[in-house]
Amino acid sequence: MGKLFGTDGVRGVANRDLTPELAYKLGRAAAYVLKKKYNGQGIVVGKDTRISGDMLETALAAGILSVGLNVLRVGVMPTPAIAYLTRELKATAGAVISASHNPMEDNGIKFFSGSGFKLPDEVEEEIEKYVLGEKEIPIRPIGAEIGRVREISDAVLLYKSFAKNTVELPFSGLRVVVDCANGAASYVAPKIYEELGAEVIPIFNTPDGTNINANCGSTHPEALMRAVVEEGAHLGLAHDGDADRVLAVDEKGNLVDGDQIMVIIGKYLKKKGLLKNNRIVVTVMSNLGLKKAFAREGIEVLETKVGDRYVLEEMLKNGAIIGGEQSGHIILLDHNTTGDGIITALQLMQVIVAEGKKLSELAQEMPKFPQVLKNVRVLDKEKIMASEELAKAIARGEKKLGEGRILVRPSGTEPLIRVMAEGADAKLTEEVVDEIIAVIEKL
């Protein structure tokens, strides 16, 4: 990856790292590069509910307009809705101003191609060269050639209609608590679930620009877990700031994570004869229980590095229609080109209604192995990862765990080594992790 773009676009503290000046340059460079690569009506621009969204949207739009491309403005909108609208409006590309589940001080800008997929690395690298001044943008249109802003007033209606059409059964009788993370889901998710017949109790659905993801949403589901029990609901749904992921809570107040949601949806699709190529893509961090649950069903599990970008690549390469992460970032390629928390929630509710089972019963189809994850701060990740002592410690741990597994990997962004183990016995699993950490700390 280049100097600006990370695995999920350009991110940083708004107005310090991600400044309006940088947003303008990004808009200008992206519009110039994407205009040459893809035909279309302009660039769809949407955002989440962060206070810095207005500032960055204005600057990004100015950059796009300055190279003669139109801006199709959709306002506050879930990230996956922008991927869909980019396709639906036959746009050149899509741009999202969001930092997803990060704190409100952060923001980010990422782009989708005209087909609604994240941009390939080489396109991001080309955009980067223009932003950093390594290449000069040779055009400066004047007069009638300058771009215009078009307000897409029916954007919410278009996405709502699209999302609702991904399910067949009404949700009447379902009582659902929905945590909108004070983010982009606030204006869309509760309405979609209600219009399909569910009784919806929304919480954290009053964004003020500064409360996005604040002790709420998929990274802080504790309030939702309590609310589901207090309200006597059948389930709870926790979105994050840009609604590209969802976690669920069963009627007893227990968390149902992305691994369990994939097992529930994957098994249902197989039963209905809809699981194309009979395979699913997960990351190395997915719980061992997931692999065992799918093995029992004869479903092939493919593993990738952590990150939805890698999950999507593997899905496209192997013709899989479902893939995702424990965090609730799940891609259902039959419906959308990126992780879509609202559409994932709809498929989950469809299984509950179709099977006539409680979510707690469905979640039991994947018994979770106790998982222990600890981080060790180190000076030289490469040296430690290559050491023979570490390899021996891992082998000893694997022997001790028996049926479990151990994963030791360096962090991609910090000076840390992550040690994760899974096993049938929680106490033994923790002991094994601590023993490996003790070896790392001596190296």
From Swiss-Prot:
GO terms for molecular function: magnesium ion binding; phosphoglucosamine mutase activity; phosphomannomutase activity. It catalyses: alpha-D-glucosamine 1-phosphate = D-glucosamine 6-phosphate. Its cofactor is Mg(2+). One of its GO terms (biological process) is UDP-N-acetylglucosamine biosynthetic process. Activated by phosphorylation. Mg(2+) binds at residues 100, 240, 242, 244. Binds 1 Mg(2+) ion per subunit. NCBIfam families: glmM (TIGR01455), PRK10887.1 (NF008139). This is Phosphoglucosamine mutase. The gene is glmM.
